């Protein structure tokens, strides 16, 4: 397992946090996602099943901007 912190723009409220957490944790290979209102997400994932580019893509598909 690997844990990374991504910077996320566009998080405005608790609903954004909840929705983004759900989107990430539903992704195959993601063990946990701690999304913070301040625009950070700590994500623990299995590198053999998902990569950082896929995590960023899912975040962007949900309407947010993400960078490492």
Swiss-Prot record:
Residues at which a metal cation binds: 13, 16
Gene3D superfamilies with a match to the protein in the record: 3.30.70.100
GO molecular function, one term: metal ion binding
InterPro entries: Heavy-metal-associated_CS, HMA_dom, HMA_dom_sf
Keyword Lipid metabolism belongs to the record: no
Domain HMA residue range list: 2-67
Name of the protein in its database record: Uncharacterized protein HI_0291
Organism: Haemophilus influenzae (strain ATCC 51907 / DSM 11121 / KW20 / Rd)
